[in-house]
């Protein structure tokens, strides 16, 4: 094992028994051979479970939608990339020449994906308890800063954070119709996101309100919120 990977293990707070798992977790798809996408898939599932379980225990009075929004804040790409930068993870990534030249080692999505892959690798290396312990340790500051007040955000913000947590494209809003006189208009808006086959719709006395209604409809269609909160 190289000195550099030993340093990364110290930063992560975990020593791998199988060093090949660690190397694979750091290997981007642009690099020749096997890559970290399968480990990322596994790590994403573990991260969401561990975060959800911890939130369930920490906020016993929270409703389902509130827990979902808190979890989205914890596992979003921005949060994971920030953690990854704290570990200097970009220095250890195995990237293809094109990604290296374009600065892929600094890219938020690549850093977040690699951290999820490391979670998956730790799980395969030592089991669920080891993975849970590391996730909770890494997210201690984020967990301690959460309150239920954080769930009192408007639907557009909640939808954006949910999509960002899954590395999805942001929603696209379009005014498709306007009814009424200038002093008493009704705006009709459609919200399009890649995760849904159909556009979500909203209407209101202003474009802003119509967009919020459309975003709320999208959250319900995604199953993030049930519409009864």
UniProtKB/Swiss-Prot annotation:
It comes from Pseudomonas savastanoi pv. phaseolicola (strain 1448A / Race 6). Mg(2+) binds at residues 40, 113, 116. The active site is at residues 44, 116. GO terms for biological process: mRNA processing; regulation of gene expression; rRNA processing; tRNA processing. The keyword rRNA-binding applies. Residues 5-127 form the RNase III domain. Its EC number is 3.1.26.3. This is Ribonuclease 3. Its main location: cytoplasm. Residues 154-224 form the DRBM domain. One of its GO terms (molecular function) is ribonuclease III activity. It is an enzyme of class 3 (hydrolase). Digests double-stranded RNA. Involved in the processing of primary rRNA transcript to yield the immediate precursors to the large and small rRNAs (23S and 16S). Processes some mRNAs, and tRNAs when they are encoded in the rRNA operon. Processes pre-crRNA and tracrRNA of type II CRISPR loci if present in the organism. It holds the Pfam family Ribonucleas_3_3. It is found in: Cytoplasm.
């Amino acid at each position: 094992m190289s000195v550099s990977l030993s340093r990364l293990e110290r930063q992560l707070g975990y020593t791998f028994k199988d060093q090949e798992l660690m190397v694979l977790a750091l290997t981007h798809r642009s690099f020749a051979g096997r890559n970290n996408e399968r480990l990322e898939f596994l790590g994403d599932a573990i991260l969401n479970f561990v975060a959800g379980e911890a939130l369930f225990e920490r906020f016993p009075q929270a409703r389902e939608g509130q827990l979902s929004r808190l979890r989205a804040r914890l596992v979003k790409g921005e949060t994971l990339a920030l953690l990854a930068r704290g570990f200097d993870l970009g220095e250890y990534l195995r990237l293809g020449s094109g990604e290296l030249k374009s600065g892929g080692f600094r890219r938020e999505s690549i850093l977040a994906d690699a951290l999820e892959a490391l979670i998956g690798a730790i799980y395969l290396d030592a089991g669920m308890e080891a993975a849970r312990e590391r996730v909770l340790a890494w997210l201690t500051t984020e967990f301690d800063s959460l309150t239920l007040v954080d769930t009192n955000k408007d639907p557009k913000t909640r939808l954006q954070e949910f999509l960002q947590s899954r590395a999805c494209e942001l929603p696209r809003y379009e005014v498709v119709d306007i009814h009424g006189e200038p002093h008493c208009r009704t705006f009709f808006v459609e919200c399009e996101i890649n995760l849904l086959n159909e556009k979500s719709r909203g209407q209101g006395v202003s474009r802003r309100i119509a967009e919020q209604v459309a975003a709320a409809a999208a959250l319900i269609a995604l199953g993030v919120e049930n519409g009864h909160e």
